[in-house]
Amino acid sequence: RDRYICIPKSEKNLKSGTVTIGVSETALHLFLLPKLEKFHKLYPHIKLKISNHSTPQAIKALRKGFVDFSIVTTPLYCEHPLQSQRLCSFRDILIGGPSYRDIGFSPKRLRDLQDFPFISLNEGTATRNFYEKYFYQNQLVFSPDMETATTNQILSLVQHDLGIGFCPEALAKDYLDRGEIIEIPVKEHSNPRDICLLTDSTRPIGIAGKKLLEILMDSEG
């Protein structure tokens, strides 16, 4: 009687399969990596295909069916049949290199920082859109002197005293702790930003994808 063990079909399917994910750089580093580590330990045979996108690109990839789901940062705009669900929040700070240490002792108004060279992500990214709106709300124009493709590049450029820029606090922490960069407090506080999961309600997600979604939605995992 014990010779034949019934293995649920869902468990069989998890011996193989592929999950495709569109993810922005910030969402990858601040949220997704530890979740993927847990998923890979539980289901080592599942292949993961990860595409690095800006938020608008990730929305487009999901709409076209190139990915099973996307994980992105706000601000974002998605229409039916796409659905958005908040996963966590994060906070950006303004950072500068060693030569900017003198301006880091007290909060500064954005207007007083306009003459310093700003480093920013390229146009068409959620981060760039966020700061263009943030400056506009404070009657200013955000016109960076240097544009990069990734947040890590912003960190490197700031570290080498090429300007100041906004960066997620969690990504800057190690650099701050080592004294390689400094935080420049700003009087006009910016709102926290969210990392969100985007799915397409018209497209079914496979068993492996659903298992990964369970891990993504687990606040303790």
Model segments located where?
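Secondary-structure junction motif
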Residues: 102-103, 117-138, 205-209, 213
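Well-formed, non-transmembrane alpha-helical positions, independent of function
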Residues: 3, 38, 60-61, 86, ...
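Short, well-ordered beta-strand segments
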Residues: 18-22, 70, 95, 119, ...
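Alpha-helical linker/hinge and terminal dimerization helices associated
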Residues: 1-12
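Acidic, Gly/Pro-rich loop/turn segments at junctions of secondary structure
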Residues: 42, 53-116, 123, 190-191
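Central regulatory/effector-binding core of bacterial HTH transcription factors
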Residues: 16-79, 148
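Hydrophobic hinge/microswitch elements
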Residues: 54-59, 63-66, 73, 127, ...
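A late-sequence structural motif
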Residues: 31, 182-221
